[in-house]
């Protein structure tokens, strides 16, 4: 039986030496929200706690400014 090997999680922001996550960088922020619009937890993405807090703050700010949607569909 074949063994399944998981990809090692790492923090992209630490690897790229990012100081502050920008709320205007919508392309990056879209990678950290689900199709339903929820913020993906750090246990799935591998993001460090410091950057996860910055990420959540940036996503919430960009939602408030209508750069990102709150949900996938508005009925």
Curated annotation (Swiss-Prot):
Assembly and binders: Part of the 30S ribosomal subunit. Forms a tight heterodimer with protein bS6.
Q: List the GO cellular component terms.
A: cytosolic small ribosomal subunit
Molecular function terms, GO-annotated: small ribosomal subunit rRNA binding; structural constituent of ribosome
Q: Does the keyword Transmembrane helix apply?
A: no
* Alphabetized UniProt keyword annotations: Ribonucleoprotein, Ribosomal protein, RNA-binding, rRNA-binding
Gene3D superfamilies according to UniProt: Ribosomal protein S18
Instruction: Name the family.
Output: Belongs to the bacterial ribosomal protein bS18 family.
To which species is this protein native? Photobacterium profundum (strain SS9)
Task: Kindly provide the name given to this protein in its UniProt entry.
Answer: Small ribosomal subunit protein bS18
* InterPro entries, per database record: Ribosomal_bS18, Ribosomal_bS18_CS, Ribosomal_bS18_sf
PANTHER family assigned: 30S RIBOSOMAL PROTEIN S18, SMALL RIBOSOMAL SUBUNIT PROTEIN BS18M
């Amino acid at each position: 039986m074949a063994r399944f090997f998981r990809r090692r999680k790492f923090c992209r922001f630490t690897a790229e030496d990012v100081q502050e996550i920008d709320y205007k960088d919508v392309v990056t922020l879209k990678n950290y929200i689900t199709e339903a619009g929820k913020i993906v937890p750090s246990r799935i993405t591998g993001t460090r706690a410091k950057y996860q807090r910055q990420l959540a703050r940036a996503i919430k700010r960009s939602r408030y400014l209508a750069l990102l949607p709150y949900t996938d569909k508005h009925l």
